[in-house]
Amino acid sequence: MIPEKRIIRRIQSGGCAIHCQDCSISQLCIPFTLNEHELDQLDNIIERKKPIQKGQTLFKAGDELKSLYAIRSGTIKSYTITEQGDEQITGFHLAGDLVGFDAIGSGHHPSFAQALETSMVCEIPFETLDDLSGKMPNLRQQMMRLMSGEIKGDQDMILLLSKKNAEERLAAFIYNLSRRFAQRGFSPREFRLTMTRGDIGNYLGLTVETISRLLGRFQKSGMLAVKGKYITIENNDALAQLAGHTRNVA
């Protein structure tokens, strides 16, 4: 049974409020490993935002770090602007991801965060979270775990761009995306790409034409079925092998 104070807090917060303990992606987010008392303390500092519309930004490069953002649904892309004025995408964030970690060092965001589709986020005031984590070892440990995961993702991306050819880059991107969907309880074999082919090419250092050509090649080989933004993995082993993995995505 849900405690009465939790119900009252939901009513006061509005229709989009979901307690951390009841959130479907809590095991991927900060609440993982926290007990009910700790969850209640965390829940008290979180602001449930209204839907973030496609194209809307959570923060811009140079903005002061005030909050971290936990994605409840949707997709957020992070990007920087080069000296030449070009956009360079640095990541795609899905439900369960936290956005804003890279601002902790300097206190200012080095990048932009923009919604690729209508998204729901929880805004977590950083100073309050930092103070709370000093009193809750489990919370601090989970924060470290999440930051470690982001660092590992950055390292994997560097390796992807430095050692793999165009085919291997795209295969690794689709393979990793399917694994991330699986972690969130979605099908790892059938999913919709929320980012454009131009975004994918920008992220992987490839042209839009190359992305389209490779998707056609993957489909012709029987590895994928592609219909617009929808991807179906037909030959899981072949994709994993091309991506540099030997285990299945499921």
From Swiss-Prot:
Changing residue 88 to E: Decrease in activity; no effect on DNA-binding. GO terms for molecular function: 4 iron, 4 sulfur cluster binding; DNA binding; DNA-binding transcription activator activity; DNA-binding transcription factor activity; iron-sulfur cluster binding; metal ion binding; transcription cis-regulatory region binding. Changing residue 81 to T: Decrease in activity; no effect on DNA-binding. Residues 140-159 are annotated as: Dimerization. This is Fumarate and nitrate reduction regulatory protein. It comes from Escherichia coli (strain K12). Residues 71-75 are annotated as: Activating region 1A. Residues 116-121 are annotated as: Activating region 1B. Changing residue 158 to A: Decrease in activity due to faulty dimerization. It holds the Pfam family cNMP_binding. Residues 112 are annotated as: Activating region 3D. Changing residue 118 to A/P: Decrease in activity; no effect on DNA-binding. SUPFAM superfamilies: cAMP-binding domain-like, Winged helix' DNA-binding domain. Residues 181-191 are annotated as: Activating region 1C. Homodimer. Residues 85-87 are annotated as: Activating region 3C. Residues 47-50 are annotated as: Activating region 2A. The keyword Transcription regulation applies.
